[in-house]
Amino acid sequence: MSKEKIIGIDLGTTNSCVAVMEGGDPVVIQNSEGARTTPSIVAFTAKGETIVGQFAKNQAITNAVNTIRSAKRFIGRRFNEAGDESKMVSYKVIRAGNDGVKFETVSGEFTPQEIAARVLQKMKKTAEDFLGHEVKKAVVTVPAYFNDEQRQATKDAGRIAGLEVERIINEPTAAALAYGFDKKKTNAKIAVYDLGGGTFDVSILELGDGVFEVKSTNGDTHLGGDDFDNVVMQWMIDEFKKQTGIDISGDKNTVQRLKEAAEKAKIELSGTSSTQINLPFITADASGPKHLDMTLTKAKFDEITRSLVERTRIPCINALKDAGLSASEIDEVILVGGSIRIPAVQALVKEIFGKEPNKSVNPDEVVAVGAAIQGGVLAGDVTDVLLLDVTPLSLGIETLGGVMTKLIERNTTIPTRKSQVFSTAADNQTTVSVHVLQGEREMASANRTLGRFDLVGIPSAPRGVPQIEVTFDIDANGIVHVSAKDLGTGKEQKIRIESSSGLSEEEIKKMVKDAEAHAEEDKKLREAADTKNELEAIVYQLEKTIGESADKLDESEKQRAQDEIKRGREAMESGDLERMKASRDSIQQVAMQIGQKIYSQAGPEQGAPGAEAGAGASQGASGTDANGEKVVDADYTVVDEDKK
């Protein structure tokens, strides 16, 4: 019996595509309508029918409120993140119970995952008709800058569609895999510029001897062809209002007509200098019906969309920087996604990388082809290819002083596993709270919360004694798992970051931009937090030493120590960096003198004070558990384990 096939699916914002390995080569499969790509559109009718693909697109104008397109732009996102996006679609976007997103239709309410599942089912059926047997497994692609929640939501969509998603891979990585599949002996550095219907990614890879290694990735999860269409549509609305005084943006069916006309105009302007937009009977007033008839030139199109094209520049520059390469060191630039046909986009790519982009791949199919190749690797049909991808954003936890302690840096090769050992920050602490974060900023509050959980039942002990190992594990799909384990008792708590919401493109872009713009500010905040942590630790230790060794010290020594402790606490309350540094240094001198005196009296068999693990290290953030007990994350020492 032959091996089970693992198909490759490009689940796109505008169109989707499916491919499979046949006879050692990837084959793009035609759907039942005879097309190699399928519109990612799902429609619901009053009769209870569900229509997917081209037929759904055909009836969109007459059934706009029940036709869901571009659902990928909502997947894994919170309702409050979708405000601007929801205003630009013809269907109704509502809040789900978990603060996620749902679409309201005549057939009921549906999540973005459910809509994506309908498209995946169409892809599954297309493959089954071609292969002549049932398909159960697939590799599904996502934008490289999709966060954990969006990846998990995509995997959930596959499960809803009846597919085991064997691997989630990044779209530009899949494109590179397809480009280099027949060039495995070639050693090259390539950039993949992927501007699709709803997302933009750029990845830098090294190819050689069948190894496809991603060096860096960057992007914008809310930038694509839809945005170009929306700009053109808004221009049409504004122009019509100037001509007639009528605002036609309020009617859903009219908006759908405008959207389709804008997309058509955009496509035509990739090959002509102007296009005529004609929509008869677009609206009516007391004087009778009104028709929309206007000309859009390529020059005007370039003018109104220039800011969108420019938004792709900084991610390209940052990707090169993270990869440690200059533009001149890139051998090939591969263009992916339907929106790369826009001449201004191609011109910008040439300007950034200093060379003509490579147009040898089909931008609509190459991602599905790469997914099929990866499916062949997983099925054992392809044996001479190794894919090494990366995680796009840093991951860590909050530690004392509101600091983000990164366990996994962005652009780390996945799968990976890293651990750090923490301890308690208070005597008799029985619970440790773990606040999981994603982002590039130094301070926790400037990053995004992915989840929180508590490890309870820690035996009462002095601060610094319990050993709590926190482990981050990112699998090959880029999905995050976090655990905390008390090494003393073996008690463990785990969390998988759930897919109730996702990052908007603005948030991700802002994370990296803010990290660069506020680098100096973050450095000062981090230094203040670390200094306060050090001061708190040494105050605690000196106070403990005095209490335990009072009989070995005279009154003047004890009084001097108490005065230093008081000044240290006052410095911590002030938050002034220089004052805390001075107090820390002064207390260290006093503590050293007292320690030497106690040690000289005690003899060599006893250890010097301040020897317990973790003293003076960064510590965790405070809170309370369900019983009102103090919960504080604490000290750490680094224990890295890389599973590449």
From Swiss-Prot:
InterPro entries, per this entry? ATPase_NBD, Chaperone_DnaK, Heat_shock_70_CS, HSP70_C_sf, HSP70_peptide-bd_sf, Hsp_70_fam
The biased composition feature labelled Basic and acidic residues covers 550-584
Q: What induces it?
A: By stress conditions e.g. heat shock.
Gene3D superfamilies linked: 1.20.1270.10, 3.30.420.40, Actin, Chain A, domain 4, Substrate Binding Domain Of DNAk, Chain A, domain 1
Residues annotated with Phosphothreonine modification: T199
Give me the stretches of Low complexity compositional bias.
600-623
What is any Pfam family matched here?
HSP70
**Keyword terms:** ATP-binding, Chaperone, Nucleotide-binding, Phosphoprotein, Stress response
Superkingdom of this protein's organism: Bacteria
Question: Which residue stretches belong to region Disordered?
Answer: 550-586, 599-644
A single GO molecular function, which one? ATP binding
What family name appears in the similarity comment? Belongs to the heat shock protein 70 family.
Q: What's the stated role of this polypeptide?
A: Acts as a chaperone.
PANTHER family in the record: HEAT SHOCK PROTEIN 70KDA
Annotated protein name in UniProt: Chaperone protein DnaK
Q: Which organism is it from?
A: Leptospira biflexa serovar Patoc (strain Patoc 1 / ATCC 23582 / Paris)
Gene giving rise to this polypeptide: dnaK
